[in-house]
Amino acid sequence: MNSSAKTASAPDSFFTATLAEADPEIAAAIKGELGRQRHEIELIASENIVSRAVLEAQGSVMTNKYAEGYPGARYYGGCEWVDVAETLAIERAKKLFGAQFANVQPNSGSQMNQAVFLALLQPGDTFMGLDLAAGGHLTHGAPVNMSGKWFKAAHYTVRRDDHLIDMDEVARRAEEVKPKLIIAGGSAYSRPWDFKRFREIADSVGAYLMVDMAHFAGLVAGGVHASPVPHAHVTTTTTHKSLRGPRGGLILCNDEALAKKFNSAIFPGLQGGPLMHVIAAKAVAFGEALRPDFKIYAKNVVENAKALAESLRGNGFDIISGGTDNHLMLVDLRPKGLRGNVSEKALVRAAITCNKNGIPFDPEKPFVTSGLRLGTPAATTRGFGVAEFKQVGGLIAEVLNAIAQADDGKAPLVEAAVKEKVKALTNRFPIYQD
């Protein structure tokens, strides 16, 4: 076959070859990950399982299109259909959260928060956020993060006795440091946020209030968690986690002048062409969250979290703050003489996926930790209810009690037995069936 014939036939393969045919190594990795998700209990609080419709949108031809700018004002031609997708995403997000303005272009939670900083702060300005060690987030001023390197972060924390945020202390701290921005929200705080009081404190010192609801946005959308949107100058959230969409970010506000600042901060400030396939998938997820059954889902997420926390407490584990009012909890492992890193690995061997996590005033290093963070969104999506989460609490206790006994011969047997129980449980609630 001559070279011209080879060139002519290449497009046939390019447009028709399956992934398994074109790249068997990646296909094998994806198949392996599908198997892992099917047969493990996912308890990482920041993870969820998206619908087949979201997967289809994210894997669509929208990935081919460059669309710098915003609907109706692009720097490229041929944007009529991606404009439809982005406009649907914007309008659905506004309706879902009761906001007047929405930017659906942030590629991630970190970038959405960076956009707020870019729009509202100058390098060196002071802002306040919950300390990472108390349940905050890297982008809320951790020293290793851009937010902590470029700006002056003054953190508030939780009380030692009950691990709750002391709003009087937040007010005192704000009066002391006079921040330009105050952030409410975090990645490992299991109790309600007093958004009204946060806004009052922000107003008292002339600060903007930003609420990062990345973790509990799905609960807000489902009506089982108070909404920060009426109180905050700006609300940010990821679109995955409890919202059950593709990985990405979202910025909401009710002020047109601020909305223009945030739009400019995203493009051209931080990003170029938006990921239109992801934005299409966001639109699908927002549409799903607007349906009545999503309210049932959100209610179940919280009920399941409470059931899991109570099951663990009944098995002798301490839960930070005594329980949970949202989708997650922190387990204090110190009464069992365990550390987070060892416990995480043992549970993974038993097909229960979670993450080690620092607890407030943790004496251990971040890669060791004294705690585990557990969440219920993913397993709730696949159909687990209160009964199943009570069972999961017992399975976790079996694994951790075995390693706490320091019997090297017993622990592997327990982990293997629990793994079989997990397999039986997950088989009752299958995902992505062929």
UniProtKB/Swiss-Prot annotation:
Its cofactor is pyridoxal 5'-phosphate. Its EC number is 2.1.2.1. Pathway: One-carbon metabolism; tetrahydrofolate interconversion; Amino-acid biosynthesis; glycine biosynthesis; glycine from L-serine: step 1/1. (6S)-5,6,7,8-tetrahydrofolate binds at L132, G136, H137, L138. It is found in: Cytoplasm. The record marks H240 as: Plays an important role in substrate specificity. It catalyses: (6R)-5,10-methylene-5,6,7,8-tetrahydrofolate + glycine + H2O = (6S)-5,6,7,8-tetrahydrofolate + L-serine. It holds the Pfam family SHMT. HAMAP family: SHMT. This is Serine hydroxymethyltransferase. It comes from Nitrobacter hamburgensis (strain DSM 10229 / NCIMB 13809 / X14). The gene is glyA.
